[in-house]
Amino acid sequence: MEGLSGNCPASHCRDFISHPALGRHSGSLASHQGTVYPDITTQDAGRQFPAPQASSGTSLGYGYAFGSPYYGCRLSYSHNVNLQQKSYHPAEKYMETSGALPAEELSSRSKEFAIYPSFASSYQTVPGYLDVPVVPGISAHPESRHEALFPMDSYQHWALSNGWDEQLYCSKEQTHFNHLWKSQFSDVVPHQAEMNGYRRGRKKRVPYTKIQLKELEKEYAASKFITKDRRRRISATTSLSERQVTIWFQNRRVKEKKFVCKSSKSSTNMHSV
C-alpha cells in the first residue's frame, strides 16, 4: 500500500492504479481470498463498506478504490461457513443487516432461509386457496414462518335477518321423503293445539264429575247469583276452587240466556206462520 501514500515512484503508481494492472498484480489480490465485482458504476466508486462488529463466524466486507473502478471483497474467517455474494450490495444494506440481528443469528438464518432453485416446483398449488409465502425476509418475525392456506371461493354469506334462507333445502330431495314425513308425524299434528295451549300457560280442561254437576245445578236452581258464603260452601262440598265455582255460574247464566233467546225466536217464527 505504499503506492497510495506517495512513497513509491510515479511509474510504479501508474502501473498499480491503472485498470489493466489487475492482471499484473493478481497475486497480491489473490491472497485476500475475496470475490471481485467488476460491474460497478462509477458513482459508487468512493463508497467503502464499513467493517461490521461480528464474531469469528461471520464475514467482513470491505472495498478498494483504485481510481474510477471499484472492487469489493469479502473475507471469511471461518472454515465451516462460506458465504459468497454473487451480486453487489451497497453499504446501507450491510448496516441494516448488522443492526437488526446479531452476528450469530445472521449466520444461522442464512442457512435456514436459503432459497433453492427447485423450491417453486417442490409442491403443487391448490386452486381456490391463497398461498402465503413460507420463506419470509431475514428481518421478519420468527413466529410468522408457517404455511397457511385460506379458502377464498368456498365462502358464502348466510343472510339470517328474517330467518333461514329459502335456498337451503332442495326440492328434489323433499319429494323422495314426503311419505316419510306424513307417516312419521301424522300423530303429532292433532296435538299441536294442545302444545300451543301448554305454551301459553293454560291448563288442560278437566270435565266435572256427575256429583259435582248435580250439586252445582242444585245451587243454581236455588239462586242464579252466588254469594261469598255459598261459594265457600260449594267449594268445600264439591272439592273445587272458589274461582271454578264462580266461572261455572257465569257460564251457566250465559248458556241459559242463549237458550231463552233461541226458544223465543222459534216461538215467534211459529206464530208468524
From Swiss-Prot:
CC annotations in GO: nucleus
The record ties this protein, via Gene3D superfamilies, to: Homeodomain-like
Q: Give the disruption phenotype, in one or two sentences.
A: Morpholino knockdown of the protein results in a biphasic developmental delay characterized by a reduced body size with 22-23 somites by 24 hpf; the first delay occurs before gastrulation and the second during late tail bud development.
Superkingdom per UniProt: Eukaryota
Is-annotated flag, keyword Transcription regulation? yes
GO BP field: fin regeneration; regulation of transcription by RNA polymerase II
Ordered alphabetically, the record's keywords are: Developmental protein, DNA-binding, Homeobox, Nucleus, Transcription, Transcription regulation
Could you cite one Gene Ontology molecular function of this protein? Answer: RNA polymerase II cis-regulatory region sequence-specific DNA binding
Give the function comment from the record. Answer: Sequence-specific transcription factor which is part of a developmental regulatory system that provides cells with specific positional identities on the anterior-posterior axis. Plays a role in early embryonic development.
The record's listing under PANTHER family reads: HOMEOBOX PROTEIN HOX-C13, SEGMENTATION PROTEIN FUSHI TARAZU-LIKE PROTEIN
> What protein am I looking at?
Homeobox protein Hox-C13b
Which organism does this record belong to? Danio rerio
